[in-house]
């Protein structure tokens, strides 16, 4: 009886470990998930749903300023 109980415990542990391992793996939607957002930004599509026209303009201007700062911060004139 002890051997049978030990065998069942080992099988249960193996089953739990394989199920945990299988459920932890996620299928990636894309290798580069930010790729779509970069394309939208390059095309000038900034989503401003529920925001006024002035606020949308401010968001775009801030985005351009941050991008300009990122790409020019290491340049020495």
Swiss-Prot record:
GO CC annotation terms, alphabetical: extracellular matrix; extracellular region
Sulfotyrosine: residues bearing it: 69, 71
Gene Ontology biological-process entries: cell differentiation; cell population proliferation
Cleaved propeptide residues: 25-68, 74-77
Subcellular location: Secreted
Signal peptide segment: 1-24
GO molecular function: growth factor activity
Family annotation (InterPro entries): Phytosulfokine
Tissues showing expression: Expressed in stems, roots, mature leaves and flowers. Most abundant in vascular bundles.
Keywords tagged on the record: Developmental protein, Differentiation, Growth factor, Secreted, Signal, Sulfation
Described function: Promotes plant cell differentiation, organogenesis and somatic embryogenesis as well as cell proliferation. May be involved in the low quiescent center cell proliferation.
Protein name: Phytosulfokines 5
Lineage summary: Eukaryota, Viridiplantae, Streptophyta, Embryophyta, Tracheophyta
């Amino acid at each position: 009886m002890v051997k049978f109980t030990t065998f069942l415990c080992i099988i249960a542990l193996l089953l739990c470990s394989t199920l945990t391992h299988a459920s932890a793996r996620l299928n990636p939607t894309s290798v580069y998930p930010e790729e779509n957002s970069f394309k939208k930004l390059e095309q000038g599509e900034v989503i401003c749903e529920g925001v006024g026209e002035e606020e949308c303009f401010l968001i775009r201007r801030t985005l351009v300023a941050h991008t300009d700062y990122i790409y020019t911060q290491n340049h020495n004139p």
